[in-house]
């Protein structure tokens, strides 16, 4: 997605733009995206072109380290898809405790770790206390 594309998307009636800035669906690996893979300057230029007419979402952010997530937010992204980040902690509870834990207790344990991880990412992304 280029800054020049923005008006075409907005004129089509979108509410949220999910630009491609080098992000991809799928796994980046434990280190997150490679150095130089994400084009923050392009994201900033897209944000400037949008000029608050629509919001910016990013797909393919699951393996972003905290500092990458924060830089994307500073560059204009307001919605980051983090499903895998939250499911991983819940799935770890399943792997570790499912063979020996009653289902109701297992669900409670999952909910607790997912809530804590959600709160941690809300702090990282600067969204805690905003709703």
Residue ranges and their predicted role:
Residues 55-66:
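Glycine-rich beta-to-alpha transition loops that act as phosphate-gripper elements at the mouths
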Residues 30-34, 60, 105-109:
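Conserved short-loop catalytic and cofactor-binding motifs
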Residues 1-52, 66-82, 88-92, 123, ...:
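Alpha/beta enzyme core
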Residues 53-54, 103:
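A short, structure-level motif marking secondary-structure boundaries and short turns
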């Amino acid at each position: 997605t280029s800054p020049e594309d923005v008006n075409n998307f907005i004129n089509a009636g979108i509410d949220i733009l999910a630009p491609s800035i080098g992000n991809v669906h799928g796994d980046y690996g434990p280190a997150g995206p490679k150095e130089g893979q994400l084009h923050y300057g392009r994201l900033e230029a897209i944000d400037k072109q949008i000029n608050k007419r629509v919001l910016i979402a990013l797909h393919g952010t699951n393996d972003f380290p905290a500092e990458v997530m924060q830089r994307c937010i500073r560059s204009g992204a307001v919605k980051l898809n983090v499903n895998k980040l939250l499911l991983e902690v819940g799935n770890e509870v399943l792997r570790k405790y499912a063979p020996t834990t009653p289902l109701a207790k297992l669900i409670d344990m999952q909910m607790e770790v997912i809530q804590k991880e959600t709160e941690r990412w809300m702090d990282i992304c600067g969204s805690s206390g905003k709703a």
